[in-house]
């Protein structure tokens, strides 16, 4: 097994990356309840948050874009960033392999393994991001990547802001024609030191997992998909293009630190970046993990100041080295 884990902290100011509802003329930001400990006990607080689904959609969008440019297989809907993922027969696309698979599942006694094999072979987004077909014989592929919400750091929880911003659409000429063309509206925006975690099961790419475990693509194809998965993560983080309302509420994002680990035989995850000491804690745990299990864990970082961690000046340099280590581990 080769496993990648990533944790980061970022100062994000004036963002509207995940909105959940409109009440009258107010568009509300997503909020989540978090629990943390103080000197007097535990406290619950509602804070701005960006959902894991939001981040997963952005990541899979980058996978789809790279897949098209690199001539990797991708299904009809994923190619236009609609990740409905063969969830119903009506949503099977127009590609010949999809039409053929649609005929197979109409027989009702189909082999679920065959369905998983065909979708993995023909769509890199569903290979990496998983899918669920709830038919007479359900077929479920668990996503090869996992990620959480972007939530404020616990050690900066008192420095969180969420407020409605006042806006006016000023259209005096249009108002003469239709009336009430000039309108006021509010958009809630959040500012905080946000944290995020991500993990990627490298070995699971191009490999079935539901009925039986087997590789269904060539080794060369697997390497190309692994590179696509890592490059998509690098592009998303470096470009800072993820989330909603970027055209008018593109936030100021400043990464404080990013830590990536690559483990060889067992999954090792970066410590939660809820506190600034997560970098030291990750390094300490990686050493104990290696001693206990005899596994090798590489620890790399961007904007970190610990001597024993491999440091890189850009996100692209960091992720390029991650790819190198992954390929090295896959050979052993």
Task: Give short role names for the model-derived ranges.
Residues 1-47, 64, 68, 80-332:
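Basic polyanion-binding and macromolecular-assembly surfaces
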Residues 45-60:
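Active/ligand-binding-proximal structured segments within catalytic/core domains
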